[in-house]
């Protein structure tokens, strides 16, 4: 069996024959966790449509140096652009939702506050939360071989986010009480603004405004899904019909 080449993200411009000193966190990971040695290979990505093949030049207690050997175009992005508005849920559920939505091809994620969300008064905590979520996105890209990093937007309140409309964007909210199914959507959709609620759902006012702002309520099926299950089911259904899972 062919040995898997580890992937890491480096956030700056890369070129052939460039020598790079890796960060302390990657040095620890490569040396202590992966137990890699001199001349072992690494795959690098840097938020472009390229992957870069590299080799370890030097490895010691404090740093690892690698050299970029070659690059290759590799675009794994779906033709369907998805901007996910995810109402903020409890830590592990939110982490899981972000991780799986990245693996399934979401391009942008905006964490949202809603009336039934328990985090409205904790805005002070969210700069650290955002960094944590961005690290989850990068780890997910390392795992699923995406080379373009989805963007985590700053958290905001649900209704201003829902009110915004961009050209050629279809607004969708999945709701167990909806009557439309995904098969009743137009045959071709290129860009989706997808809204997923938290465990408590939406208030009556929020539902009224969400519909007023142009969101199409779609039914996923006969069962009530947890928020972290709903995000997987919704994105998968959209990618099968309009994206790259068909």
UniProtKB/Swiss-Prot annotation:
* Gene3D superfamilies linked to this entry: 3.40.1280.10, Hypothetical PUA domain-like, domain 1
Q: Does the keyword Methyltransferase apply?
A: yes
> Where would you find the membrane-spanning parts of this chain?
none
Q: Which GO terms describe its molecular function?
A: rRNA (uridine-N3-)-methyltransferase activity
Organism superkingdom: Bacteria
Documented EC number(s): 2.1.1.193
Reaction equations catalysed? uridine(1498) in 16S rRNA + S-adenosyl-L-methionine = N(3)-methyluridine(1498) in 16S rRNA + S-adenosyl-L-homocysteine + H(+)
Tell me the GO BP annotations in alphabetical order.
rRNA base methylation
What keywords are annotated for this sequence in UniProt? Cytoplasm, Methyltransferase, rRNA processing, S-adenosyl-L-methionine, Transferase
Tell me where in or outside the cell this protein is found.
Cytoplasm
CDD domains, alphabetized: RsmE-like
Q: Which GO terms describe its cellular component?
A: cytoplasm
Record's InterPro entries? Answer: Alpha/beta_knot_MTases (IPR029028), PUA-like_sf (IPR015947), RsmE (IPR006700), RsmE_MTase_dom (IPR046886), RsmE_PUA-like (IPR046887), tRNA_m1G_MTases_N (IPR029026)
Q: Which family does it belong to?
A: Belongs to the RNA methyltransferase RsmE family.
> PANTHER family, per this entry?
16S RRNA (URACIL(1498)-N(3))-METHYLTRANSFERASE, RIBOSOMAL RNA SMALL SUBUNIT METHYLTRANSFERASE E
Q: What this chain does, per the record?
A: Specifically methylates the N3 position of the uracil ring of uridine 1498 (m3U1498) in 16S rRNA. Acts on the fully assembled 30S ribosomal subunit.
Q: How does it assemble?
A: Homodimer.
How is this protein named in the record? Ribosomal RNA small subunit methyltransferase E
Q: Which organism is it from?
A: Buchnera aphidicola subsp. Schizaphis graminum (strain Sg)
The gene from which this protein is expressed is: rsmE
